[in-house]
């Protein structure tokens, strides 16, 4: 059974801050890596973001969580501020 991707309600804001090249690159990485094997490509996070994973794409980070066969993407930001932004978002909204 393949994975299904769901997005946090604020992900659109993250993507709107990126240029078209970066958005395309991130979209391709999600399709090529996360849909195929999110456990292999994502690194587990620790501390306040324990239970989440991160996918590195150049200077950007995709923070996600795996729940059964769903990949819930919480945010996409530059590596310098991703952790602070994600921690401030709190619980995942699966919609």
List each language-model region with its residue ranges.
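Hydrophobic coiled-coil of the DHp/HisKA dimerization-phosphotransfer domain
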Residues: 5-7, 55
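Enriched for short, Lys/Arg-rich terminal
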Residues: 2-5, 13, 24, 65-95
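Basic/aromatic recognition patch in beta-strand/loop cores that engages polyanionic ligands
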Residues: 40-81
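N-terminal first-folded block
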Residues: 7-41
């Amino acid at each position: 059974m393949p994975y299904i991707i769901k997005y946090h309600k604020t992900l659109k804001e993250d993507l709107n801050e990126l240029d078209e090249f970066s958005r395309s690159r991130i979209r391709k990485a999600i399709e090529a890596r996360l849909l195929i094997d999110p456990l292999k490509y994502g690194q587990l996070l620790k501390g306040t973001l324990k239970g989440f994973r991160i996918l590195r794409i150049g200077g950007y980070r995709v923070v996600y969580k795996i729940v059964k066969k769903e990949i819930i993407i919480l945010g996409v930001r530059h590596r310098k501020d991703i952790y602070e932004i994600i921690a401030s978002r709190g619980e995942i909204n699966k919609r």
